[in-house]
Amino acid sequence: MPLPPSTLNQKSNRVYSVARVYKNACEERPQEYWDYEQGVTIDWGKISNYEIINKIGRGKYSEVFSGRCIVNNQKCVIKVLKPVKMKKIYRELKILTNLTGGPNVVGLYDIVQDADSKIPALIFEEIKNVDFRTLYPTFKLPDIQYYFTQLLIALDYCHSMGIMHRDVKPQNVMIDPTERKLRLIDWGLAEFYHPGVDYNVRVASRYHKGPELLVNLNQYDYSLDLWSVGCMLAAIVFKKEPFFKGSSNPDQLVKIATVLGTKELLGYLGKYGLHLPSEYDNIMRDFTKKSWTHFITSETKLAVPEVVDLIDNLLRYDHQERLTAKEAMDHKFFKTKFE
């Protein structure tokens, strides 16, 4: 078997954790499906077909504009990539071309390049998103059931294709409530999963980082994305946005431990032969695991037992114990009728 990409991730000498599902999704496909190290053949579109209307956002790796295709007058989103290693750009392009057309994955229309700077831009479908800070507080239980099912469908699809998103958070989940349409966007941190590879833990956004990233467990897998889903769900249900609000990466794990317990954290580390990194020496205290009822108040009308049980099965230290996307969709919360 050819070695998976090696510059960003390393094949490990000691395999201590392998995904419970879809572990060989990449191995079962030809090497050109996942190997972005050799470069990617790009079918460049014409940049003159698109015009920028206005800027709608910027991230670490890109600037995002609303735009229009002048050929068919269709609105679109134009993501102009900032100059980074070509390997990272190749990875995003390969992942997007593999996934586009999949359920609830943002549609990639075209890839164009500025003639002078050679900087690539990605042309995506436009979603009339309502900001989560406005939208989520309006959700009733049937809305949570519907939209989280849509999100889990997207995740189960990308996982089945051997791809971890690695940056699931409200800002990357576009929802158009009029059309009841959800799209998972921003695949810039996504990566192909290969068993026994040590992955970079500097991924995901702080409030949605799984404990595995915070304790330098490099052999993580798709289950990382399910922790992030659990964080989103807990924030909505317990009316606490974000649910775990650390002031730094080490403090993020402390915030998690105040809820899930320190003894349980040490048990997790022990199982995988890891030690708490030294940056926790002065900040990690002996926290007792809290019951989820601790977060239920007269305000948390959505915190029915079924959804709390789902949260409990997603927010687990041990990534192997978390529900997979498919298992989560089969959870009783999604089968219960709410008014």
UniProtKB/Swiss-Prot annotation:
GO terms for cellular component: CURI complex; cytosol; nucleolus; nucleoplasm; nucleus; protein kinase CK2 complex; small-subunit processome; UTP-C complex. Residues 50-334 form the Protein kinase domain. It is an enzyme of class 2 (transferase). Keywords: ATP-binding, Kinase, Nucleotide-binding, Serine/threonine-protein kinase, Transferase. SMART domains: S_TKc. Tetramer composed of an alpha chain, an alpha', one beta chain and one beta' chain. Interacts with FACT subunits POB3 and SPT16. Interacts with NAP1. Interacts with YTA7. This is Casein kinase II subunit alpha'. The lineage of its organism: Eukaryota, Fungi, Dikarya, Ascomycota, Saccharomycotina.
